[in-house]
């Protein structure tokens, strides 16, 4: 693996683990309609992994148009900018329209925003599945209605937390496969800093104007 691929091993392992968790529901399949909410590095890598699995009906949801355009490069077939829609009903309709009048069979929630977690249930069909992996840290409580959002829809919900050693081995295969089909994973690394400029790198990361910020020792 080249240096850029090696830089991406750790975040990609997070998504390999999440997708493997999602597969345990039996709902994530070759022909599934999949919504991915959040187009930061985690969401973008999620889309890339789904594409390497052969899943082609993927809608990306985010409020940043530049990141949505990047999502298309990673394999998303449709995008929905939530900034262009007023209220959850209108946003849900946009997601439904992106799947030609259907709700998602499965969804990945890749943000740490409690409101985003509450919203995503609306995007999923009855009997569908959801993998929540956005809350690596405590982002606060999410307000959902268990009757309407979980029970009545019989949603299959799985959580995902980082990765295992086995996921690392699978990640190597994914990175080779992604490169082989032309997915621009290396473009996720928007900025590289030498070790002596680590403070500048951390500042850039906090500004959230890039995607993956790498510190590369000379």
Give, region by region, the residue ranges found by the protein language model:
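Hydrophobic/small residue at the entry helix of a nucleotide-binding pocket
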Residues: 14, 42, 50
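NAD(P)H dinucleotide-binding glycine-rich loop of Rossmann-like/cofactor-binding domains
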Residues: 1-37
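Adenosine-nucleotide cofactor-binding segment
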Residues: 36-39, 51-119
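Glycine- and other small-residue-rich loops at beta-strand/loop junctions that grip anionic moieties
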Residues: 7, 35-39, 60, 80, ...
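Local beta-strand N-terminus motif with an aromatic residue
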Residues: 31, 76, 100-104, 185, ...
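C-terminal hydrophobic helical "lid"/dimerization subdomain
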Residues: 118-122, 165-218
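A generic alpha-to-beta junction signature in SAM-dependent methyltransferases
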Residues: 26-28, 99, 111, 123-125
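Glycine-rich phosphate-binding loop and adjacent beta-alpha segment
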Residues: 114-177, 217-218
């Amino acid at each position: 693996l080249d240096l850029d691929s090696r830089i991406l091993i750790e975040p990609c392992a997070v998504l390999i683990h999440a997708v493997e968790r999602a597969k345990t529901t039996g709902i994530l399949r070759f022909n599934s309609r999949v919504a991915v909410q959040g187009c930061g590095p985690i969401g973008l890598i999620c889309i890339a992994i789904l594409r390497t699995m052969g899943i082609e009906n993927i809608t990306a949801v985010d409020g940043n148009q530049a990141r949505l355009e990047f999502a298309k490069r990673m394999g998303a077939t449709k995008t929905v900018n939530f900034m262009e829609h007023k209220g959850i009903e209108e946003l849900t309709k946009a997601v439904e329209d992106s799947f030609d009048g259907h709700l998602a069979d499965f969804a990945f929630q890749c943000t740490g925003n409690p409101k985003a977690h509450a919203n995503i249930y609306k995007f999923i069909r009855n009997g569908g599945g959801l993998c929540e992996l956005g809350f690596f840290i405590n982002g606060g409580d999410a307000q959902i209605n268990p009757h309407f959002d979980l029970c009545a829809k019989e949603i299959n919900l799985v959580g995902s937390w980082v990765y295992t050693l086995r996921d690392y081995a699978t990640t190597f295969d994914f990175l080779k496969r992604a490169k082989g089909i032309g997915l621009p994973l290396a473009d996720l690394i928007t900025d590289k800093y030498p070790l002596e400029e680590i403070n500048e790198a951390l500042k850039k990361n906090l500004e959230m104007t890039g995607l993956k910020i790498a510190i590369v020792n000379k």
